[in-house]
Amino acid sequence: MQKETPNALRKHDNFEIIFFELDNDSCPVQDFLDSLNDKMAAKVYGMMDVLAEFGNELREPYTKELEDEIYELRAKTGTDICRVLFFFRSGKKIIIPMDL
């Protein structure tokens, strides 16, 4: 099964998800997502679609504010859990950084 490649950008009618990119156009977030097994990658991309649709209205158990407007998106398959950090910006943008 081939993993979906969003080219560092996922856009819905409601919110736009933007992956952090380095100056050399590499995308550590995409590299991380590409390293996941197919099942977990599908779950994370599915949760990103839900996040893009509901934005700041999405709550636990799917998202959680950690501190100072930094959130985590949670994806779980079986006993495996993946957490992706993100924050909101004006203009209905969700930024997924390389690291915080």
Where are these regions (language model features)?
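Basic, Lys/Arg-enriched alpha-helical interface segments
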Residues: 1-81, 90-94
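Conserved beta3 VAIK motif of the Hanks protein kinase fold
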Residues: 97
